[in-house]
Amino acid sequence: MISKPDKNKLRLKRHRRVRGKISGTAERPRLSVFRSNTNIYAQLIDDVAGVTLASASTLDKSVSKDATKVEQAQAVGKAIAEAGKAKGITEVVFDRGGYIYHGRVKALADAARENGLEF
């Protein structure tokens, strides 16, 4: 019988490999993205101090539940960019979390760029 590779295990493997190479600082935090089946989450993380500086997700009240998943991801990207600007953050290191740069992850990244984050 042919064994099918577990997609989440492969994603976690990619994520660990990338995390070994990138790290966020207070001046240039890591924009970490996590995608579940129903929601998407974004955090600005200072890896040196080990703290989350700002976060946004589809669970926030500002994000419409009636919108499509891609539209919700765009709203989260806008929200995380605004939260970062409020804390004086303009440059980040993008961590796609092992996900393919497509769909909801790309929509979040593009919206964050349009609203003032540079990466």
UniProtKB/Swiss-Prot annotation:
Keywords: Ribonucleoprotein, Ribosomal protein, RNA-binding, rRNA-binding. One of its GO terms (cellular component) is cytosolic large ribosomal subunit. One of its GO terms (molecular function) is structural constituent of ribosome. GO terms for biological process: translation. Pfam families: Ribosomal_L18p. It comes from the Bacteria. This is one of the proteins that bind and probably mediate the attachment of the 5S RNA into the large ribosomal subunit, where it forms part of the central protuberance. PANTHER family: 39S RIBOSOMAL PROTEIN L18, MITOCHONDRIAL, LARGE RIBOSOMAL SUBUNIT PROTEIN UL18M. Part of the 50S ribosomal subunit; part of the 5S rRNA/L5/L18/L25 subcomplex. Contacts the 5S and 23S rRNAs. Belongs to the universal ribosomal protein uL18 family. This is Large ribosomal subunit protein uL18. It comes from Lactobacillus delbrueckii subsp. bulgaricus (strain ATCC 11842 / DSM 20081 / BCRC 10696 / JCM 1002 / NBRC 13953 / NCIMB 11778 / NCTC 12712 / WDCM 00102 / Lb 14).
